[in-house]
Amino acid sequence: IREDMVSRGLGDVYKRQMNLTLNDQQQKITGSETIIYHNNSQDKLEYLWLQLDQNKRAQGSDSYKIQTGNIKSLNTRSIKNMEPEFEGGFNITNVTKKDGSKQAYTIHKTMMRINLDKPLLPGTNFTFNVDWWYNINNRMEIGGRSGYEYFEEDDNYLYTIAQFFPRMCVYNDTEGWQNKQFLGSGEFTLPFGDYDVKIAVPTDHVVAATGNLVNANEILSEEQIKRLELAKKNEKEPVFIVNEKEAIKNEKQRKKGMKTWHFKAENVRDFGWASSRKFIWDAMVVKQKSNDVLAMSFYPKEGNPLWEQYSTKTVAHTLKCYSKYTFDYPYPVAISVHSKWIGMEYPMICFNGGRPDEDGTYSKRTKYGMISVIIHEVGHNYFPMIINSDERQWTWMDEGLNTFLQYLTEQEFEKGYPSRRGPAYRIVDYMKGNKKRISPICLLYTSPSPRDTMS
């Protein structure tokens, strides 16, 4: 672990190695991980906590108990969401210590506690392994921040995958463990770490993920490698690594076998990825004073012509504007992935909606809605992915800062951009709304200084 990570006062930092397999026939993920957890706090830790977000969909989950509504709010998705046959949630198959012996643990709903044999002293580390699997949810029917979209016309799946592994909770010096249950609507509190992830997918799939692709020479064709290198030099227009014609050909094939994509990411608080044989892939470089960033997009043909015209250019524009107003983007890539009806962010990668009609036409509302969601979700790389606030407790922190910068970025995209937010008068309708749905901004610090609310 690098000294700069420790010197910033992070309560905990860890290294993680993961091996994942995507079963495209059963829509299932199987994974194993090795976690090296460093206790950088001043406290002895009697146990460690991990987050099991997929247990939100397990039978008996508390998330079902808090959902409210009325007959007027019922729609097809609501009815589908009531169906009990989806068997969601993590299936933890093995937890072991570094030497392979059994590690004691306790699962409580969306949290898992690692019961240590002896306290983990300050400045020491603990290594353990977890094996698991879970069924991927059909996001178009039962919703979710991640899942799959099924394309019936060509019998293909597009996977946008997140919260897919047992994730470390945060331990800080003011509150201890942040182990509030995940009910679905709240977001996340996460520590920084280094990720080494191998993802086995069908051999004809294209994968996008947090971090650098480190085995491109093994999985990409010579032509694709040439295109990728060209994209790293092109600042004006995106370069297609996989174009639409190639993607259409690819989605019609069913090649046998699996291929492993290998990604590494340093100093990130989470990991997300996407996989499909439908993906078109384009990229261009954004040059900064401190480093170059590869802006990329992955999308099915159903996203065109909108996505090939605007997605990657919007990613690049967002990086330039946010970096101008804040700091240079420190990561090597920034990725926009298209799936329908979504807007969700993870380090270096985000999942965005905005789809033309079936005939390829689209309204101004669709166009600007797509551009705005890309700006917003790419912008979340700065808040909270880099400025690491506690989303579970203080959602307004990252959303407020990000929405403000989103407005500035939209106005620089083109003159007269139809921003939904920005000027003060735009908040009036919200403030006049149902008071039961308006949460006050409360600073619930547990010490006189707010220094620990952001890492």
Regions found by a protein language model. Give the residues of each.
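Single conserved hydrophobic/aromatic residue that forms the stacking wall/gate
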Residues: 1-10, 14, 445-455
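Early extracytoplasmic/domain-onset interaction patches
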Residues: 2, 11-51
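Short, hydrophobic/aromatic-enriched beta-strand segments in well-ordered soluble domains
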Residues: 33-35, 52-54, 124-138, 195-203, ...
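A surface-exposed beta-strand-loop module
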Residues: 38, 73-151, 249-255
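Glycine/proline-rich low-complexity spacer/linker segments in large multi-domain proteins
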Residues: 60-74, 133-195
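Hydrophobic helix-coil surface modules that form long, contiguous segments used
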Residues: 166-177, 183-375, 404
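Catalytic Zn2+-binding segment of zinc metalloproteases
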Residues: 381-392
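Acidic/His/Gly-enriched intrinsically disordered linker/tail segments
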Residues: 399, 403-447, 451, 455
